[in-house]
């Protein structure tokens, strides 16, 4: 088999919204530049995601030199400019973590509140914000638990072969997609090099109901697919369902689509039960 290569790089500036495909990217300690650097919360500061507000996956963002441009169904275009952010910081909650986050503006709050029909606020991972990966001295953005997620195309193909209706890779929201490897080969990788960056695979990624939300329609699958099928062959002893690998970057540097994936070291893969 040919060398494994990086085939897609995606950053998700706003947690739970559409990703942006990149040809090349700067990788920092927190992951891809800008990835999950914005979060939407309720009025108490608790984070909101596509798990409960699936329409978020239909929010499209484009990166500009001064901020972001947002579009969503039925909404006017919104321009987000860093220079217009407030200087106010407030504690927000992402899972069990409290993070001091920079409030952006009332205008952006109102835009998302109107779109979701739910009162909410919009925050940025500002220069005074700090969060770390649980158990590691490693900076983290508003991502669920780790800075980066990697999945191979072969693994998705193996899943889709078991599904009546195949799903797109976007439904799993990876940052890095690789090809030209065996299905679930990434389960056994420990350290890899892509471009200028060495990555450590920390753990497999536990999957939730968000994977059942169609990235085009914004609707949740009534049969809870692909999660129901994944459960049949990717459930571990802890009863969690895993698909993809969580990574941390061991140094800053650039990566680009087409880069070779060098497998530096391996470790024993997680074991999974198989059911009919």
Protein language model annotation of sequence segments:
Residues 1-276:
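Metal-cofactor-dependent catalytic cores
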């Amino acid at each position: 088999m040919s060398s494994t290569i990086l085939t897609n790089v995606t950053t998700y500036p706003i947690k739970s919204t559409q990703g942006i495909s990149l040809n090349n990217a700067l990788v920092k300690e927190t992951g891809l530049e800008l990835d999950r650097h914005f979060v939407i919360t309720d009025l108490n500061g608790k984070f909101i995601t596509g798990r409960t507000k699936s329409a978020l996956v239909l929010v499209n963002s484009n990166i500009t030199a001064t901020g972001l441009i947002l579009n969503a169904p039925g909404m006017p275009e919104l321009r987000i400019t860093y220079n217009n952010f407030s200087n106010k910081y407030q504690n927000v909650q992402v899972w069990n973590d409290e993070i001091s986050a920079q409030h952006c503006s009332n205008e952006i709050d109102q835009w998302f509140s109107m779109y979701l029909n739910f009162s909410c606020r919009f925050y940025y991972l500002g220069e005074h914000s700090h969060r770390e990966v649980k158990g590691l001295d490693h900076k983290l953005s508003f991502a669920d638990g780790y800075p980066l997620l990697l999945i191979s195309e072969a693994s998705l193909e193996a899943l889709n072969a078991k599904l009546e209706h195949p799903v797109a890779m976007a439904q799993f929201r990876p940052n890095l997609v690789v090809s030209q490897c065996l299905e679930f080969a990434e389960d056994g990788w420990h350290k890899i090099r892509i471009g200028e960056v060495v990555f450590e695979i920390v753990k497999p990624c536990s999957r939730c109901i968000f994977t059942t939300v169609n990235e085009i329609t914004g609707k949740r699958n009534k049969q809870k697919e692909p999660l129901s099928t994944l459960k049949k062959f990717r459930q571990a002893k802890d009863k969690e369902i895993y698909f993809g690998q969580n990574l941390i970057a061991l140094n800053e540097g650039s990566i680009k689509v087409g880069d070779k994936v060098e497998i530096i070291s391996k470790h024993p893969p997680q074991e999974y039960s198989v059911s009919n």
